[in-house]
Every structure is written in C-alpha cells, then in structure tokens.
Amino acid sequence: MADSQQVATYPSLRDKTVLITGGAEGIGAAAAELFARQQSKVLILDIAKDSAQRLIERVESLSRENERNTGRPLPIPLFYYCDVSDIDQVSSVANRILQEHKLIHILINNASVAGASSHKSTMSVTPESWDFDFRVNLKHMFFFTQALVPAMKENGGGSIVNMGSISWRIPAVGLPAYTTTKAATMGLTRSHSKEFGPWNIRVNSVMLGSTATERQVKEILTPAYREQVWAAQSLKRDVRPEEVARVVMFLASDEASAVTGSSYVVDGGWCGDP
C-alpha cells in the first residue's frame, strides 16, 4: 500500500482491539496496517514469523512518519504464533489473549489455506487433506468466535468478519474441499448473525474473487490465469489486497452499525452480489 494513499477515517475504530487470524501476509497484513492507521490495537495470529516481523517493521516506519506529521504514533501490531489447524493451539492462544487483553472488540477470521495448496481435485483429496482444509478454513473460525463472543456480549457488542470466497459460486474446478468450506462460511455467518444479534454483535462475511496477494501472484495468478480472470471480471485489472481490507474495515466500524448477516462480494465484478 502506498504510504501517501488516502484512507478513510473511522473514529469508532480508535482504541479498539482487533484480532486478525492469518494476519501476517496478504489480505490479513493489509487489514492489520489499515486498522493500525485507525489507532486500533491489532493482534495478528499466524505461523509466518518472518512475514509478521516485516509487517511490524513496516507499521513501525509508518508510526514514525505519523508521529512526525500528527504528533501521535501508531499502535504497533502484536504477533501471536498460532497454527490454526491445531485446535489445542487455537484454544490456548484464545485463552492467553483473553487473559492479556480481556476483550476483543473486533474479530477478523481470515486464516485460510491459500495459493497452490488449496488446489486439489476430487480424485487427489484424501481424508487427511479434507480434514486439514476444514481445520484451517472453518474450524478455527467457529472456535475463536466461541471463545471471544462471551466478552463481547458482556461489553455490549462487537463485530466479527469472516473471510469467504466466490469460489463456490463460479465454475471453480479442482478445489472441492476449499469451495465447500467457503460455502459453509456464509452459512456460519448467517447463523451467528441471528444468534448474536440480540447481544449487539454483528457478524458479516467478505467473499473474495481473485486477489493479487504476493502468494497468489507467485503460485496461481499466471499470465494465462490472469487473462481468464480479467475476462470474467467487469474490472479488467487485478483486485489488490488493500481493496478487500478496506471493506473489512468498513464492516468492522460503526459506519456499518446496521449491517449484519451480510456477505460483501469483492471480486472486481466476477459474479456480483449473492
């Protein structure tokens, strides 16, 4: 993201504690930076230690610049190592975070199998790979939500954003486990929005198309595939991670205070609204 790029300001996000799973790279990292710019306290969970350190160093640089310009530094993201495929780690990290921070105002369930590893045809899927995709893409989403919602309820509300995909709505061939988990994400979002609504906890999802993260560009977005994507999209260009992250930030803010149970599509016009 260009340092000079103008970013909308959401006063309701100031001093809020935001937890982002898969927050060290791609859309998660873009979201972490945007929330830090809003003066939110950002907690990033990931297994990518080096990427997390690079993100922290980038925000430190932005913080110094912001302090020079405005007199106020940016909060520096805190990194927690967490392999979301391991439910015991999910539980222990959630407990540690609650002990250290008491309350998460905003939960971004972003961690997911990404890049080439998500592409397994039906005949190449094994019971182990099927279970792995469900642990990484869906199971942690449910159990982090389960762990953090009670404190949100006690505090009078909160916001949860689940990261989905349009893959189950287009003829996406060769990734049946992935598409199944992403369809389930919409179902979980709608179910939780009804269950948690009386507690003023909003639950929404963002459905991605092809997003030009560093990993996607390296492993998936070949010139031939990019040509196919652009042909399918209304916008004939790449969708950038920060463009997705801006929608996440809006949904997390009080500007979306009446929005819950919704799935926002950010796909350059590939399939449009659900």
Model-derived features: where do they sit?
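Substrate-binding pocket helix/loop in short-chain dehydrogenase/reductase
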Residues: 118-122, 126-134, 229
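Canonical Rossmann dinucleotide-binding motif of NAD(H)/NADP(H)-dependent dehydrogenases/reductases
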Residues: 8-43
